[in-house]
UniProtKB/Swiss-Prot annotation:
Protein name: Large ribosomal subunit protein bL32
Spans annotated as Disordered: 1-23
GO MF terms held by the record: structural constituent of ribosome
Record key words, sorted: Ribonucleoprotein, Ribosomal protein
Protein family: Belongs to the bacterial ribosomal protein bL32 family.
GO biological process, any: translation
Source lineage: Bacteria, Pseudomonadati, Chlamydiota, Chlamydiia, Chlamydiales
């Protein structure tokens, strides 16, 4: 099994991990109701997906 011969500094460790942060979720705009929603999912405000009514949403 591989064992490191020399200690890695904190700076070197942090530089290596600089790309490990969570990325922000992108938002798309619904063509039916113009509300923001997560891409490739059903719009939670109107229930449309890809221009078709997939589910019914109760209006408050």
């Amino acid at each position: 099994m591989a064992v490191p011969r020399n200690r890695h500094s904190n700076a070197r460790k942090n530089i290596r991990r600089s790309h490990h942060a969570k990325q922000a979720r992108h938002a798309a705009v619904c063509n039916n109701c113009k509300q923001a929603f997560i891409p490739h999912t059903v719009c939670t405000s109107c229930g449309f997906y890809n221009g078709k009514a997939v589910m019914t949403v109760e209006k408050k």
